[in-house]
């Protein structure tokens, strides 16, 4: 598939915002106290990321003014369900921020609702792709696992960076081990998906498409002399070397370097925020690379006709 940066930005930003809110909700339910300034900054950042992600997703629409119609098919469409859950989650985060601004503590019900809506939003987003059975790379439970784990890991690392900056040592001590654990878990899940995808074989072949029973069928032409929607939207047009470099960025910047920085901070006993912000700075381009590869690796069956030419 051709990765659209608007969708990549939306899923990375929204996923990290969900993870950040989940970390705050778990801290609230676990009785870990957090200062008003920290909560305002963390919830405000989550709101900005959610709104920015939503704005980025509009750039992918051919007719943005018709976006409201996307919610009409909620009974059968995971995209419609996402369109409903995302504003609900954003509104809940805004309500929490307002309560923090007024100096009130978050009710237990609000924290539980935040956890539930975050989980539901990950489900809706992942199922948009996992429900497409004809794209083998996506049609697997690992799609949901990876969307959830990557969001939790990035959000938890961001929560630790903010906690270190605001001197919230109790919250940092509670969240730091989870940030490292979730980063390794997300790395393992993404590696498992990459290994699985590398071994997939197309279910359709030139022989099955044409009905020719010859052992070897060679396609000589696409049947067209110019580009079209099919050749633009369903193939990334990047070289094998470029894809390999993106894969290196995924592993190195997205997971290995942030994990190394977190381990170094833990072993040195340092609570300086620089370690955590360096981890965030490394993780952002790494996760953009991860999400680009997620889309680029998806092989649409139509590419057997439009892309395989001798």
Segments (PLM) and residue ranges:
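N-terminal signal-anchor module of multipass membrane proteins
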Residues: 1-52, 284, 296-297, 308
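N-terminal juxtamembrane cytosolic/stromal segments of multi-pass membrane proteins
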Residues: 1-3, 65-69, 300
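Long, contiguous internal "core" modules enriched in hydrophobic/ aromatic residues
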Residues: 5, 11-13, 32, 76-77, ...
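Membrane-helix interface motif
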Residues: 19, 23-29, 62-64, 158-168
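Membrane helical hairpin/interfacial module
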Residues: 36-92
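Short helix-terminus and kink motifs of transmembrane alpha helices
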Residues: 61, 65, 189, 295-299
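C-terminal structured interaction module
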Residues: 275-310
